[in-house]
Protein backbone atom coordinates (compact mmCIF):
# COMPACT_ATOMS: atom_id res chain seq x y z
CA UNK A 1 0.00 0.00 0.00
CA UNK A 2 2.88 2.36 0.77
CA UNK A 3 4.36 1.78 -2.70
CA UNK A 4 1.02 2.61 -4.26
CA UNK A 5 0.75 5.87 -2.33
CA UNK A 6 4.27 6.95 -3.29
CA UNK A 7 3.67 6.14 -6.96
CA UNK A 8 0.39 8.02 -6.95
CA UNK A 9 2.03 11.03 -5.26
CA UNK A 10 4.83 11.11 -7.84
CA UNK A 11 2.30 10.88 -10.66
CA UNK A 12 0.24 13.67 -9.12
CA UNK A 13 3.29 15.94 -8.91
CA UNK A 14 4.27 15.22 -12.51
CA UNK A 15 0.85 16.08 -13.93
CA UNK A 16 -0.11 18.86 -11.52
CA UNK A 17 0.77 21.61 -13.96
CA UNK A 18 -1.24 19.98 -16.72
CA UNK A 19 -4.29 19.50 -14.52
CA UNK A 20 -4.27 23.01 -13.09
CA UNK A 21 -4.52 24.45 -16.58
CA UNK A 22 -7.85 22.72 -17.14
CA UNK A 23 -11.25 23.62 -15.76
CA UNK A 24 -11.21 23.14 -11.97
CA UNK A 25 -14.77 21.97 -11.40
CA UNK A 26 -16.29 19.05 -9.55
CA UNK A 27 -18.85 16.80 -11.24
CA UNK A 28 -21.26 16.25 -8.33
CA UNK A 29 -24.29 14.68 -10.03
CA UNK A 30 -25.54 12.79 -13.07
CA UNK A 31 -24.92 15.05 -16.06
CA UNK A 32 -22.76 17.37 -13.98
CA UNK A 33 -25.47 20.05 -13.93
CA UNK A 34 -29.22 20.32 -13.42
CA UNK A 35 -29.93 20.57 -17.16
CA UNK A 36 -28.39 17.07 -17.63
CA UNK A 37 -26.77 18.28 -20.82
CA UNK A 38 -23.65 16.09 -20.97
CA UNK A 39 -21.25 18.89 -21.89
CA UNK A 40 -18.18 20.20 -20.04
CA UNK A 41 -15.98 23.26 -20.59
CA UNK A 42 -12.86 21.33 -19.55
CA UNK A 43 -9.78 21.81 -21.74
CA UNK A 44 -6.63 19.84 -22.42
CA UNK A 45 -8.25 16.41 -22.32
CA UNK A 46 -6.44 13.55 -24.06
CA UNK A 47 -7.47 12.18 -27.45
CA UNK A 48 -6.46 8.68 -26.39
CA UNK A 49 -4.89 6.64 -23.59
CA UNK A 50 -3.53 3.17 -22.98
CA UNK A 51 -5.50 1.31 -20.27
CA UNK A 52 -2.46 -0.86 -19.48
CA UNK A 53 -2.21 -4.43 -18.27
CA UNK A 54 -4.42 -5.95 -15.59
CA UNK A 55 -2.94 -6.07 -12.08
CA UNK A 56 -3.91 -8.48 -9.36
CA UNK A 57 -5.82 -7.15 -6.36
CA UNK A 58 -7.97 -4.03 -6.14
CA UNK A 59 -5.74 -1.36 -7.67
CA UNK A 60 -7.05 -1.81 -11.19
CA UNK A 61 -4.50 -1.87 -13.99
CA UNK A 62 -0.86 -0.93 -14.24
CA UNK A 63 -0.11 2.72 -14.95
CA UNK A 64 0.25 3.50 -18.64
CA UNK A 65 0.20 6.39 -21.10
CA UNK A 66 -2.11 9.26 -20.06
CA UNK A 67 -3.46 7.25 -17.09
CA UNK A 68 -3.00 8.96 -13.73
CA UNK A 69 -4.41 5.96 -11.89
CA UNK A 70 -6.93 3.15 -12.26
CA UNK A 71 -8.91 1.29 -9.64
CA UNK A 72 -10.91 -1.95 -9.68
CA UNK A 73 -14.70 -1.84 -9.34
CA UNK A 74 -17.10 -4.79 -9.44
CA UNK A 75 -17.76 -6.59 -12.71
CA UNK A 76 -20.87 -4.70 -13.87
CA UNK A 77 -20.95 -0.91 -13.63
CA UNK A 78 -23.86 1.06 -15.08
CA UNK A 79 -23.97 4.17 -12.90
CA UNK A 80 -21.58 6.98 -13.74
CA UNK A 81 -18.98 8.34 -11.31
CA UNK A 82 -19.43 11.65 -9.50
CA UNK A 83 -16.59 13.71 -8.09
CA UNK A 84 -17.06 16.18 -5.24
CA UNK A 85 -15.08 17.45 -2.27
CA UNK A 86 -11.99 15.38 -3.03
CA UNK A 87 -13.92 12.10 -3.27
CA UNK A 88 -15.22 9.89 -6.06
CA UNK A 89 -18.44 7.91 -5.74
CA UNK A 90 -19.50 5.18 -8.17
CA UNK A 91 -22.10 2.41 -8.17
CA UNK A 92 -21.21 -1.15 -9.17
CA UNK A 93 -21.88 -4.76 -8.15
CA UNK A 94 -20.19 -7.10 -5.66
CA UNK A 95 -18.51 -9.54 -8.05
CA UNK A 96 -15.12 -8.27 -6.88
CA UNK A 97 -15.66 -8.03 -3.08
CA UNK A 98 -13.51 -5.63 -1.08
CA UNK A 99 -14.65 -7.01 2.28
CA UNK A 100 -14.86 -10.73 3.04
CA UNK A 101 -17.93 -10.26 5.21
CA UNK A 102 -19.94 -9.21 2.15
CA UNK A 103 -20.36 -12.17 -0.13
CA UNK A 104 -22.84 -12.89 -2.88
CA UNK A 105 -24.85 -10.71 -5.22
CA UNK A 106 -25.20 -7.19 -3.81
CA UNK A 107 -25.42 -3.60 -4.92
CA UNK A 108 -22.37 -1.50 -4.06
CA UNK A 109 -21.56 2.20 -3.92
CA UNK A 110 -17.80 2.74 -3.60
CA UNK A 111 -16.06 5.88 -2.37
CA UNK A 112 -12.44 6.66 -3.29
CA UNK A 113 -10.07 9.54 -2.66
CA UNK A 114 -9.91 11.69 -5.77
CA UNK A 115 -6.17 12.28 -5.77
CA UNK A 116 -4.93 8.68 -5.73
CA UNK A 117 -7.96 6.31 -5.75
CA UNK A 118 -7.39 5.24 -2.15
CA UNK A 119 -10.44 3.18 -1.13
CA UNK A 120 -12.35 4.95 1.66
CA UNK A 121 -15.64 3.14 2.23
CA UNK A 122 -18.54 1.36 0.55
CA UNK A 123 -22.29 0.94 0.84
CA UNK A 124 -23.09 -2.75 0.34
CA UNK A 125 -26.79 -3.51 -0.14
CA UNK A 126 -28.26 -7.05 -0.25
CA UNK A 127 -30.21 -7.90 -3.39
CA UNK A 128 -33.98 -8.18 -3.30
CA UNK A 129 -34.87 -11.79 -3.96
CA UNK A 130 -36.97 -12.54 -7.03
CA UNK A 131 -39.90 -14.89 -6.67
CA UNK A 132 -43.62 -15.13 -7.22
CA UNK A 133 -44.76 -11.91 -8.89
CA UNK A 134 -41.62 -9.97 -8.00
CA UNK A 135 -38.52 -9.29 -10.11
CA UNK A 136 -37.58 -5.78 -9.05
CA UNK A 137 -33.83 -6.25 -8.60
CA UNK A 138 -32.28 -8.01 -11.58
CA UNK A 139 -29.32 -10.28 -10.82
CA UNK A 140 -25.79 -8.83 -10.92
CA UNK A 141 -26.82 -5.30 -11.88
CA UNK A 142 -25.57 -3.71 -8.66
CA UNK A 143 -26.40 -0.08 -7.86
CA UNK A 144 -27.28 1.41 -11.26
CA UNK A 145 -28.13 4.94 -10.15
CA UNK A 146 -25.58 7.74 -10.23
CA UNK A 147 -25.37 9.47 -6.81
CA UNK A 148 -25.60 13.20 -6.13
CA UNK A 149 -23.28 14.90 -3.64
CA UNK A 150 -23.72 18.18 -1.80
CA UNK A 151 -21.43 19.21 1.03
CA UNK A 152 -21.06 16.36 3.51
CA UNK A 153 -23.96 14.33 2.13
CA UNK A 154 -24.26 11.81 -0.69
CA UNK A 155 -27.71 10.78 -1.97
CA UNK A 156 -28.37 7.66 -4.02
CA UNK A 157 -31.18 5.30 -5.01
CA UNK A 158 -30.17 1.77 -4.04
CA UNK A 159 -31.03 -1.52 -5.72
CA UNK A 160 -33.61 -2.08 -2.95
CA UNK A 161 -35.92 0.70 -4.20
CA UNK A 162 -34.80 3.05 -1.43
CA UNK A 163 -33.33 6.54 -1.33
CA UNK A 164 -30.50 6.87 1.16
CA UNK A 165 -28.61 9.87 2.49
CA UNK A 166 -25.00 9.01 3.37
CA UNK A 167 -22.24 10.73 5.30
CA UNK A 168 -19.39 11.30 2.82
CA UNK A 169 -16.94 10.32 5.59
CA UNK A 170 -18.46 6.85 5.99
CA UNK A 171 -18.35 5.26 9.44
CA UNK A 172 -14.76 6.40 9.96
CA UNK A 173 -16.05 9.41 11.92
CA UNK A 174 -18.75 7.51 13.84
CA UNK A 175 -22.31 6.39 13.23
CA UNK A 176 -24.40 9.53 12.86
CA UNK A 177 -28.15 9.31 13.22
CA UNK A 178 -31.01 9.25 13.05
CA UNK A 179 -30.53 5.95 11.16
CA UNK A 180 -28.17 3.74 13.17
CA UNK A 181 -29.18 0.20 12.16
CA UNK A 182 -26.56 -0.29 9.45
CA UNK A 183 -25.43 -3.62 10.92
CA UNK A 184 -28.83 -5.18 10.28
CA UNK A 185 -29.44 -3.28 7.05
CA UNK A 186 -26.28 -4.71 5.46
CA UNK A 187 -27.01 -8.29 6.62
CA UNK A 188 -27.81 -10.98 4.09
CA UNK A 189 -31.44 -12.05 4.68
CA UNK A 190 -32.05 -15.73 5.36
CA UNK A 191 -35.41 -15.52 3.62
CA UNK A 192 -37.36 -12.83 1.80
CA UNK A 193 -40.66 -12.66 -0.08
CA UNK A 194 -42.49 -9.71 -1.66
CA UNK A 195 -46.28 -9.72 -1.68
CA UNK A 196 -48.52 -7.29 -3.57
CA UNK A 197 -51.23 -6.80 -0.95
CA UNK A 198 -54.09 -4.43 -1.86
CA UNK A 199 -52.99 -2.05 0.91
CA UNK A 200 -49.46 -1.87 -0.48
CA UNK A 201 -46.34 -3.99 -0.99
CA UNK A 202 -45.57 -6.25 1.95
CA UNK A 203 -42.26 -7.92 2.76
CA UNK A 204 -41.95 -11.17 4.67
CA UNK A 205 -38.31 -11.26 5.72
CA UNK A 206 -36.01 -13.19 8.01
CA UNK A 207 -33.32 -10.52 8.34
CA UNK A 208 -30.35 -12.73 9.12
CA UNK A 209 -27.40 -12.04 11.39
CA UNK A 210 -26.19 -8.43 11.71
CA UNK A 211 -22.74 -7.74 10.29
CA UNK A 212 -19.83 -6.35 12.27
CA UNK A 213 -19.37 -2.77 11.13
CA UNK A 214 -16.02 -1.15 10.41
CA UNK A 215 -14.61 2.20 9.26
CA UNK A 216 -14.90 1.24 5.57
CA UNK A 217 -18.67 0.75 5.83
CA UNK A 218 -21.14 3.43 4.77
CA UNK A 219 -22.91 5.62 7.33
CA UNK A 220 -26.61 5.99 6.50
CA UNK A 221 -28.13 9.23 7.80
CA UNK A 222 -31.67 8.48 6.67
CA UNK A 223 -33.45 6.01 4.40
CA UNK A 224 -36.70 6.36 2.41
CA UNK A 225 -38.21 3.05 1.28
CA UNK A 226 -40.30 3.74 -1.84
CA UNK A 227 -42.09 0.38 -1.64
CA UNK A 228 -43.17 0.98 1.93
CA UNK A 229 -43.84 4.71 1.83
CA UNK A 230 -45.50 5.25 -1.58
CA UNK A 231 -46.43 1.70 -2.73
CA UNK A 232 -43.93 1.42 -5.58
CA UNK A 233 -43.48 -1.99 -7.22
CA UNK A 234 -40.07 -1.90 -8.94
CA UNK A 235 -39.47 -3.60 -12.28
CA UNK A 236 -35.98 -4.98 -13.05
CA UNK A 237 -33.98 -2.16 -11.44
CA UNK A 238 -34.15 1.06 -9.43
CA UNK A 239 -31.97 3.37 -11.49
CA UNK A 240 -33.07 6.99 -11.03
CA UNK A 241 -30.29 9.49 -10.39
CA UNK A 242 -31.62 12.03 -7.88
CA UNK A 243 -31.56 15.81 -8.31
CA UNK A 244 -30.99 18.36 -5.53
CA UNK A 245 -32.44 21.88 -5.45
CA UNK A 246 -32.43 23.86 -2.23
CA UNK A 247 -33.90 21.67 0.49
CA UNK A 248 -35.61 19.43 -2.06
CA UNK A 249 -34.55 16.05 -3.37
CA UNK A 250 -36.37 15.00 -6.57
CA UNK A 251 -36.56 11.27 -7.25
CA UNK A 252 -38.17 9.23 -10.03
CA UNK A 253 -39.78 6.01 -8.81
CA UNK A 254 -39.11 2.63 -10.49
CA UNK A 255 -42.80 1.65 -10.48
CA UNK A 256 -43.79 -0.85 -13.17
CA UNK A 257 -45.31 -4.17 -14.10
CA UNK A 258 -45.01 -7.37 -12.10
CA UNK A 259 -43.18 -10.50 -13.19
CA UNK A 260 -45.99 -11.48 -15.57
CA UNK A 261 -45.40 -8.23 -17.49
CA UNK A 262 -49.17 -8.00 -17.93
CA UNK A 263 -50.20 -6.23 -14.75
CA UNK A 264 -49.26 -3.06 -12.86
CA UNK A 265 -49.80 -3.92 -9.18
CA UNK A 266 -49.88 -0.30 -7.97
CA UNK A 267 -51.09 2.11 -10.69
CA UNK A 268 -51.71 4.83 -8.09
CA UNK A 269 -48.05 4.99 -7.07
CA UNK A 270 -46.38 8.29 -8.01
CA UNK A 271 -43.96 8.81 -10.87
CA UNK A 272 -41.96 11.39 -8.90
CA UNK A 273 -41.47 12.13 -5.22
CA UNK A 274 -39.98 15.15 -3.48
CA UNK A 275 -38.13 14.56 -0.22
CA UNK A 276 -36.63 16.86 2.38
CA UNK A 277 -32.90 16.37 1.81
CA UNK A 278 -32.12 16.83 5.52
CA UNK A 279 -34.64 14.36 6.94
CA UNK A 280 -35.92 12.18 4.10
CA UNK A 281 -39.49 13.25 4.84
CA UNK A 282 -41.93 12.93 1.93
CA UNK A 283 -42.96 16.43 0.86
CA UNK A 284 -44.79 15.95 -2.44
CA UNK A 285 -45.76 13.57 -5.26
CA UNK A 286 -46.60 14.33 -8.89
CA UNK A 287 -50.15 14.72 -10.20
CA UNK A 288 -49.63 13.23 -13.68
CA UNK A 289 -51.36 9.96 -12.75
CA UNK A 290 -49.59 7.80 -15.33
CA UNK A 291 -49.65 4.57 -13.32
CA UNK A 292 -52.02 2.54 -15.48
CA UNK A 293 -50.32 3.79 -18.67
CA UNK A 294 -46.82 2.51 -17.84
CA UNK A 295 -45.63 0.20 -20.60
CA UNK A 296 -43.01 -1.70 -18.62
CA UNK A 297 -41.11 0.29 -16.00
CA UNK A 298 -39.66 3.70 -15.15
CA UNK A 299 -35.91 4.23 -15.37
CA UNK A 300 -35.47 7.88 -16.34
CA UNK A 301 -33.97 10.63 -14.16
CA UNK A 302 -35.16 14.22 -13.67
CA UNK A 303 -33.58 17.37 -15.05
CA UNK A 304 -34.27 20.98 -14.11
CA UNK A 305 -34.04 24.46 -15.63
CA UNK A 306 -35.53 27.94 -15.41
CA UNK A 307 -37.87 28.79 -18.29
CA UNK A 308 -39.20 32.35 -18.54
CA UNK A 309 -38.57 32.92 -14.84
CA UNK A 310 -40.21 29.66 -13.75
CA UNK A 311 -38.21 26.66 -12.53
CA UNK A 312 -39.38 23.47 -14.22
CA UNK A 313 -38.61 19.83 -13.46
CA UNK A 314 -38.47 17.54 -16.52
CA UNK A 315 -38.94 13.78 -16.46
CA UNK A 316 -39.24 10.97 -19.00
CA UNK A 317 -42.26 8.85 -18.18
CA UNK A 318 -42.83 5.13 -18.42
CA UNK A 319 -45.72 5.96 -20.77
CA UNK A 320 -43.47 7.58 -23.39
CA UNK A 321 -44.40 11.16 -22.49
CA UNK A 322 -41.89 13.79 -21.41
CA UNK A 323 -43.32 15.83 -18.53
CA UNK A 324 -42.59 19.24 -17.06
CA UNK A 325 -43.63 20.11 -13.50
CA UNK A 326 -43.42 23.28 -11.47
CA UNK A 327 -40.38 22.56 -9.30
CA UNK A 328 -41.97 24.27 -6.30
CA UNK A 329 -44.51 21.82 -4.83
CA UNK A 330 -47.89 22.97 -3.63
CA UNK A 331 -48.06 22.28 0.13
CA UNK A 332 -50.14 19.35 1.30
CA UNK A 333 -53.06 19.58 3.71
CA UNK A 334 -54.16 17.44 6.62
CA UNK A 335 -50.85 15.62 6.89
CA UNK A 336 -50.88 14.56 3.24
CA UNK A 337 -47.93 15.21 0.91
CA UNK A 338 -47.98 18.19 -1.38
CA UNK A 339 -48.28 18.16 -5.16
CA UNK A 340 -45.85 18.58 -8.02
CA UNK A 341 -48.15 20.24 -10.55
CA UNK A 342 -47.77 19.31 -14.19
CA UNK A 343 -47.09 22.27 -16.51
CA UNK A 344 -46.93 20.35 -19.78
CA UNK A 345 -46.58 16.92 -21.34
CA UNK A 346 -45.26 15.86 -24.72
CA UNK A 347 -45.82 12.50 -26.43
CA UNK A 348 -42.36 11.37 -27.56
CA UNK A 349 -43.77 8.51 -29.65
CA UNK A 350 -44.70 9.59 -33.19
CA UNK A 351 -48.37 8.89 -34.01
CA UNK A 352 -47.47 6.05 -36.39
CA UNK A 353 -45.71 4.22 -33.54
CA UNK A 354 -49.00 4.07 -31.61
CA UNK A 355 -51.73 3.72 -34.23
CA UNK A 356 -51.95 1.69 -37.44
CA UNK A 357 -55.01 1.44 -39.69
CA UNK A 358 -57.03 3.14 -36.98
CA UNK A 359 -56.11 0.56 -34.35
CA UNK A 360 -53.75 0.90 -31.37
CA UNK A 361 -50.31 -0.63 -31.82
CA UNK A 362 -49.47 -2.92 -28.92
CA UNK A 363 -46.35 -2.38 -26.86
CA UNK A 364 -43.80 -4.89 -28.16
CA UNK A 365 -42.31 -6.81 -25.26
CA UNK A 366 -41.25 -10.00 -27.01
CA UNK A 367 -37.62 -10.80 -26.33
CA UNK A 368 -35.41 -10.77 -29.38
CA UNK A 369 -37.89 -9.04 -31.69
CA UNK A 370 -36.32 -7.00 -34.46
CA UNK A 371 -37.65 -4.08 -36.41
CA UNK A 372 -41.12 -4.22 -34.85
CA UNK A 373 -42.66 -0.76 -34.74
CA UNK A 374 -44.27 -0.08 -31.36
CA UNK A 375 -44.51 2.61 -28.70
CA UNK A 376 -41.69 2.95 -26.19
CA UNK A 377 -41.04 4.38 -22.75
CA UNK A 378 -38.32 6.92 -21.97
CA UNK A 379 -35.19 5.56 -20.31
CA UNK A 380 -32.86 8.46 -21.11
CA UNK A 381 -32.85 11.72 -19.17
CA UNK A 382 -34.42 14.79 -20.81
CA UNK A 383 -31.62 17.24 -21.66
CA UNK A 384 -32.37 20.98 -21.53
CA UNK A 385 -30.65 23.64 -23.62
CA UNK A 386 -31.78 27.12 -24.68
CA UNK A 387 -35.47 26.65 -23.79
CA UNK A 388 -35.62 23.33 -25.60
CA UNK A 389 -35.81 19.79 -24.25
CA UNK A 390 -34.23 16.88 -26.13
CA UNK A 391 -35.00 13.25 -25.32
CA UNK A 392 -34.94 9.77 -26.89
CA UNK A 393 -37.30 6.82 -26.46
CA UNK A 394 -36.27 3.22 -25.84
CA UNK A 395 -37.07 -0.14 -24.32
CA UNK A 396 -35.53 -2.97 -22.35
CA UNK A 397 -32.59 -4.18 -24.45
CA UNK A 398 -33.95 -7.74 -24.34
CA UNK A 399 -36.92 -6.58 -26.43
CA UNK A 400 -34.64 -6.27 -29.43
CA UNK A 401 -33.94 -3.39 -31.79
CA UNK A 402 -36.63 -1.34 -33.50
CA UNK A 403 -37.30 2.24 -34.63
CA UNK A 404 -36.76 4.93 -32.00
CA UNK A 405 -37.11 8.69 -31.99
CA UNK A 406 -35.21 11.78 -30.83
CA UNK A 407 -37.62 14.63 -30.05
CA UNK A 408 -36.98 18.34 -29.63
CA UNK A 409 -39.72 20.29 -27.85
CA UNK A 410 -40.42 23.87 -26.82
CA UNK A 411 -40.14 24.11 -23.03
CA UNK A 412 -42.02 27.44 -22.91
CA UNK A 413 -45.43 25.92 -23.76
CA UNK A 414 -48.17 24.66 -21.42
CA UNK A 415 -50.73 21.85 -21.46
CA UNK A 416 -50.55 18.91 -23.84
CA UNK A 417 -47.84 20.21 -26.16
CA UNK A 418 -47.49 17.08 -28.31
CA UNK A 419 -48.39 19.21 -31.34
CA UNK A 420 -47.95 22.82 -30.22
CA UNK A 421 -44.56 22.18 -28.64
CA UNK A 422 -43.08 19.99 -31.35
CA UNK A 423 -40.02 21.63 -32.93
CA UNK A 424 -38.75 18.53 -34.73
CA UNK A 425 -38.51 14.76 -34.60
CA UNK A 426 -35.59 12.68 -35.79
CA UNK A 427 -36.63 9.09 -36.49
CA UNK A 428 -33.50 7.83 -38.25
CA UNK A 429 -32.24 6.19 -35.06
CA UNK A 430 -33.27 3.02 -33.28
CA UNK A 431 -34.37 2.63 -29.68
CA UNK A 432 -32.05 4.39 -27.29
CA UNK A 433 -31.02 4.31 -23.65
CA UNK A 434 -28.77 7.36 -24.09
CA UNK A 435 -29.21 10.95 -22.98
CA UNK A 436 -28.51 13.44 -25.81
CA UNK A 437 -25.80 16.10 -25.53
CA UNK A 438 -26.20 19.55 -27.10
CA UNK A 439 -23.21 21.73 -27.97
CA UNK A 440 -22.47 24.44 -30.55
CA UNK A 441 -25.70 23.98 -32.47
CA UNK A 442 -25.41 20.19 -32.69
CA UNK A 443 -27.12 17.33 -30.88
CA UNK A 444 -25.18 14.12 -30.28
CA UNK A 445 -27.26 11.00 -29.65
CA UNK A 446 -26.70 7.26 -29.76
CA UNK A 447 -29.00 4.31 -30.27
CA UNK A 448 -28.75 0.81 -28.83
CA UNK A 449 -27.73 -0.70 -32.18
CA UNK A 450 -24.49 1.27 -31.94
CA UNK A 451 -24.96 4.21 -34.27
CA UNK A 452 -23.80 7.64 -33.12
CA UNK A 453 -25.86 10.47 -34.60
CA UNK A 454 -24.93 14.13 -35.01
CA UNK A 455 -28.04 16.22 -35.69
CA UNK A 456 -28.57 19.92 -36.33
CA UNK A 457 -30.09 21.32 -33.12
CA UNK A 458 -32.30 23.84 -34.95
CA UNK A 459 -33.66 21.71 -37.76
CA UNK A 460 -33.35 18.10 -36.61
CA UNK A 461 -31.59 17.18 -39.85
CA UNK A 462 -28.80 14.62 -39.80
CA UNK A 463 -25.29 16.07 -40.05
CA UNK A 464 -23.41 12.78 -39.81
CA UNK A 465 -23.71 9.27 -38.39
CA UNK A 466 -21.21 6.60 -37.49
CA UNK A 467 -21.92 2.91 -36.95
CA UNK A 468 -19.71 1.51 -34.19
CA UNK A 469 -21.27 -1.94 -34.78
CA UNK A 470 -21.37 -2.32 -31.00
CA UNK A 471 -24.35 -1.96 -28.68
CA UNK A 472 -24.47 1.32 -26.77
CA UNK A 473 -25.83 1.83 -23.24
CA UNK A 474 -23.83 4.92 -22.32
CA UNK A 475 -24.50 8.54 -23.28
CA UNK A 476 -22.31 10.78 -25.44
CA UNK A 477 -20.12 13.17 -23.46
CA UNK A 478 -18.84 16.38 -25.09
CA UNK A 479 -15.73 18.20 -23.87
CA UNK A 480 -12.67 19.94 -25.29
CA UNK A 481 -13.82 19.63 -28.90
CA UNK A 482 -14.36 15.89 -28.56
CA UNK A 483 -17.27 13.47 -28.18
CA UNK A 484 -16.54 10.47 -25.94
CA UNK A 485 -18.75 7.40 -26.48
CA UNK A 486 -18.50 4.00 -24.77
CA UNK A 487 -19.80 0.70 -26.13
CA UNK A 488 -20.92 -2.60 -24.65
CA UNK A 489 -18.21 -4.48 -26.52
CA UNK A 490 -15.56 -2.63 -24.56
CA UNK A 491 -14.40 0.30 -26.66
CA UNK A 492 -14.22 4.01 -25.96
CA UNK A 493 -14.70 5.95 -29.19
CA UNK A 494 -13.45 9.52 -29.45
CA UNK A 495 -14.94 11.69 -32.20
CA UNK A 496 -14.15 15.26 -33.16
CA UNK A 497 -17.06 17.48 -32.14
CA UNK A 498 -18.42 19.40 -35.10
CA UNK A 499 -20.09 19.09 -38.48
CA UNK A 500 -17.34 17.07 -40.08
CA UNK A 501 -17.22 13.45 -39.00
CA UNK A 502 -13.83 12.43 -37.73
CA UNK A 503 -12.91 9.44 -35.59
CA UNK A 504 -9.97 10.54 -33.46
CA UNK A 505 -9.35 7.25 -31.68
CA UNK A 506 -10.86 3.94 -30.63
CA UNK A 507 -9.55 2.65 -27.31
CA UNK A 508 -9.83 -1.01 -26.30
CA UNK A 509 -10.91 -1.21 -22.67
CA UNK A 510 -10.86 -4.13 -20.21
CA UNK A 511 -14.63 -4.58 -20.34
CA UNK A 512 -17.92 -3.09 -21.44
CA UNK A 513 -18.29 0.69 -21.17
CA UNK A 514 -21.97 1.06 -20.23
CA UNK A 515 -21.53 4.12 -18.00
CA UNK A 516 -20.78 7.60 -19.31
CA UNK A 517 -17.33 9.23 -19.03
CA UNK A 518 -17.15 12.51 -17.10
CA UNK A 519 -14.56 15.13 -16.28
CA UNK A 520 -13.72 16.93 -13.05
CA UNK A 521 -10.85 19.22 -12.09
CA UNK A 522 -9.05 18.61 -15.36
CA UNK A 523 -9.24 14.82 -15.24
CA UNK A 524 -11.26 12.59 -17.56
CA UNK A 525 -12.86 9.66 -15.71
CA UNK A 526 -13.73 6.62 -17.81
CA UNK A 527 -15.60 3.73 -16.14
CA UNK A 528 -15.59 0.27 -17.68
CA UNK A 529 -17.61 -2.54 -16.12
CA UNK A 530 -14.52 -3.52 -14.10
CA UNK A 531 -12.27 -0.48 -13.71
CA UNK A 532 -12.40 3.28 -13.22
CA UNK A 533 -9.65 5.19 -15.04
CA UNK A 534 -8.43 8.70 -14.24
CA UNK A 535 -7.05 10.00 -17.52
CA UNK A 536 -4.77 13.04 -17.84
CA UNK A 537 -2.71 14.14 -20.81
CA UNK A 538 0.96 13.56 -20.05
CA UNK A 539 0.50 11.11 -17.17
CA UNK A 540 2.70 8.00 -17.19
Predicted regions and their residues:
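Noncatalytic, solvent-exposed loop/strand surfaces
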Residues: 22-540
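Bacterial N-terminal signal peptides
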Residues: 9-18
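N-terminal secretory signal peptides that target proteins for export/translocation
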Residues: 1-7
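Short amphipathic alpha-helical "recognition" segments used for binding
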Residues: 7-8, 29
Amino acid sequence: MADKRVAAWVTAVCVAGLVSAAAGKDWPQWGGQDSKNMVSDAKGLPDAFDPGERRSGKTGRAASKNVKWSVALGKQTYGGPVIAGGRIFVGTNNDNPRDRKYRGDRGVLMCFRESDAEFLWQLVVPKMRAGGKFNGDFAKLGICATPAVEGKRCYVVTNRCAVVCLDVEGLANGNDGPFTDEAQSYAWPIGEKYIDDPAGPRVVRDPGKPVKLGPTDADIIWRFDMMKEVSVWPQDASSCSVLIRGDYLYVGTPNGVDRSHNRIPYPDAPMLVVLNKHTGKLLAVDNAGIGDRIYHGQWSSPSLATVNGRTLLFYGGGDGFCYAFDAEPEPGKGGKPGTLKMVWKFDCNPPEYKTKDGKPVKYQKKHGSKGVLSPCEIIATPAFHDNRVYVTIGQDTRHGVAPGCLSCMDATKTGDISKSGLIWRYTALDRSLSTPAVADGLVYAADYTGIVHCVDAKTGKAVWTHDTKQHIWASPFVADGKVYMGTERGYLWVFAAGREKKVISRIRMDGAVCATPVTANGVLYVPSHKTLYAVVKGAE
